[in-house]
Amino acid sequence: LQYIERLDPEREPGRLTFIVRMGADKIRDKLPELVERSPPPATVAWITDPMHGNTYEAAPVHKTRRFDDVLDEVKGFFEVHKSLGTHPGGIHVELTGDDVTECVGGGDEIFVDDLHQRYETACDPRLNRSQSLDLAFLVAEMYRDQ
């Protein structure tokens, strides 16, 4: 928050975008203070990146993420904004339309033991087609309920 004055001294709406990536276990505790200490809500676009704060090593070879943790961080993001009367600006996720096995959980019930089957990422684990659609529908419901 110390950079706000330098980056947006005129408080131009839409100039600043804050992308938070805290992890499902921290979002509800840490985000409220950041939102409350930031400039008026109309000047900042808030986005959550629920992927990076929920990455862990499942085996010596595979980084992964639990779909339920990703979803919980998104839910926490929406809950915090709703409780503060601010607007959740969006989400950033890594995903693919392919049927990869890089993140565990979701409607297809991918387990850690399944990761080796189609672990194709060159960098970070992505949600597969089914997990991406599951998340998209759940986020649409969250926006509807805002």
From Swiss-Prot:
It catalyses: D-erythrose 4-phosphate + phosphoenolpyruvate + H2O = 7-phospho-2-dehydro-3-deoxy-D-arabino-heptonate + phosphate. One of its GO terms (molecular function) is 3-deoxy-7-phosphoheptulonate synthase activity. It holds the Pfam family DAHP_synth_2. Keywords: Amino-acid biosynthesis, Aromatic amino acid biosynthesis, Transferase. One of its GO terms (biological process) is aromatic amino acid family biosynthetic process. Pathway: Metabolic intermediate biosynthesis; chorismate biosynthesis; chorismate from D-erythrose 4-phosphate and phosphoenolpyruvate: step 1/7. The keyword Transferase applies. Its EC number is 2.5.1.54. Belongs to the class-II DAHP synthase family. Homodimer. PANTHER family: PHOSPHO-2-DEHYDRO-3-DEOXYHEPTONATE ALDOLASE, PHOSPHO-2-DEHYDRO-3-DEOXYHEPTONATE ALDOLASE 1, 2. This is Phospho-2-dehydro-3-deoxyheptonate aldolase. It comes from Streptomyces lividans.
